[in-house]
A protein has these predicted regions:
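Sec/Tat signal peptide C-region and signal peptidase I cleavage site
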Residues: 21-25
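Acidic, glycine-anchored loop motifs typical of Ca2+
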Residues: 208-216
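Short, functionally critical alpha-helical segments immediately adjacent to catalytic or ligand/cofactor-binding
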Residues: 41, 50-60, 121-138, 170-173, ...
């Protein structure tokens, strides 16, 4: 799931823990709530026929509410960093099956990938790695009815502004010709090979094959173009690696590399990275990249499982992967999967 949106979910969830629980959703009948959304959608130009095709017969989904309330990160087993083991996470997520599937998918889309890389500057293996992590290369896209899920989450009320916007954007998708029957995905409203949200689909999905539809469900071309467009929009730097593994000796000079900047987004993710230095400056401190990278590249040191374990010099492109899902575990697994499938 793209996560600029996940970031918003996390922020709203955290806020909800600090304030009183709002009035029950049942205080406002579901049908009345849908009518209020329909009025807003009409004011934004959505035709009544699209609204009727989506809202007719819609009911709340109790399973979605249960999943939303259970959506709490597990603490996991700690390491010297106080965080769950990155090595353990990678063993569970970058499996032989996922790697082999990525190799096959990359071969299948090789010509598309070359075209996409020329147009957007994003390597095909990065796009395929996202595809693999999000939906197992299209095999698991979710079976929840998207309008029902989004309407339920918006009606429930804790994050109404967030989910109501996505619900209205689903109506816009249908108004623009997306078949109602295609609107299935995750319980939180993400869909398609890349697990876009409706707002992301409307803004960044691409009709890569020129057939008149932005089909991120069935078209490899549209999927590749759309994920690449997301990355370009988020600031991907052409020709720069996402990270390089680095040798960090025990004697490395660690003085003055702490990151004292409090990130306004995902602070617990970014606080684990050092401050930014050039690769040349890292070399002067004894940190040696294991792969080619320009000396003037800005990079942050990240030792996910602590000193004496693998270290990485992260570039700006790592931050772009975080835009898709703001988790060090996710971003590392995507980057390393991309490296594996492109060997």
């Amino acid at each position: 799931m793209t996560f600029r949106f996940l970031r918003q979910i996390g922020a709203f969830a955290a806020a909800s823990l600090l304030c009183a629980v709002p009035a029950s959703a049942q205080d406002e009948p579901f049908d009345e709530y849908l009518e209020s959304v329909a009025m807003k959608a009409r004011s934004e130009g959505v035709r009544q026929s699209a609204i009727d095709s989506v809202f007719t017969g819609l009911t709340p989904n109790d399973r979605v509410l249960a999943l939303d309330r259970e959506n709490v990160s597990s603490s996991g087993s700690g390491t010297s960093t106080g965080f769950p083991s990155m090595a353990g996470y990678l063993a569970r997520h970058n499996t032989a099956s996922r790697i082999n599937g990525g190799v096959r998918k990359l071969a299948q889309v090789r010509s598309i990938g070359a075209e996409v890389e020329r147009q957007y500057g994003v390597p095909a293996e990065i796009i395929v790695a996202i595809w693999g992590h999000e939906t197992a290369y299209g095999q698991v896209m979710g079976g929840f009815d998207l309008p029902r899920s989004l309407a339920t989450l918006a009606w429930e009320g804790r994050r109404r502004a967030l989910f109501e916007r996505e619900l209205i954007d689903v109506l816009k998708m249908v108004d623009q010709g997306v078949p109602r029957s295609r609107l299935e995905g995750s319980w939180a409203g993400a869909f398609g090979n890349g697990q876009f949200l409706p707002s992301v689909y409307l803004r960044l999905a691409v009709d890569g094959d020129g057939d008149g539809s932005r089909d991120i469900w069935n078209s490899d071309v549209d999927t590749m173009h759309s994920i690449a467009n997301y990355f370009r929009d988020a600031g991907w730097r052409t020709g720069e690696p996402w990270a390089v593994r680095a040798y960090v000796p025990n004697s490395a000079d660690r003085s003055g590399i702490e990151n004292h900047v409090n990130s306004p987004v995902c602070p617990r993710v970014h606080e684990r990275h050092s401050r930014w230095l050039t690769v040349r400056e890292w070399r002067e401190r004894g940190v040696e990249p294991r792969s080619p990278i320009a000396d003037d590249t800005m990079a942050a040191l990240f030792e996910p499982d602590g000193p004496a374990e693998p270290g990485y010099l992260l570039t700006q492109n790592y931050r772009v992967i975080l835009e898709y899902n703001c988790s060090n575990y996710y971003a590392m697994s995507v980057g390393l999967l991309a490296d594996e499938i492109s060997r």
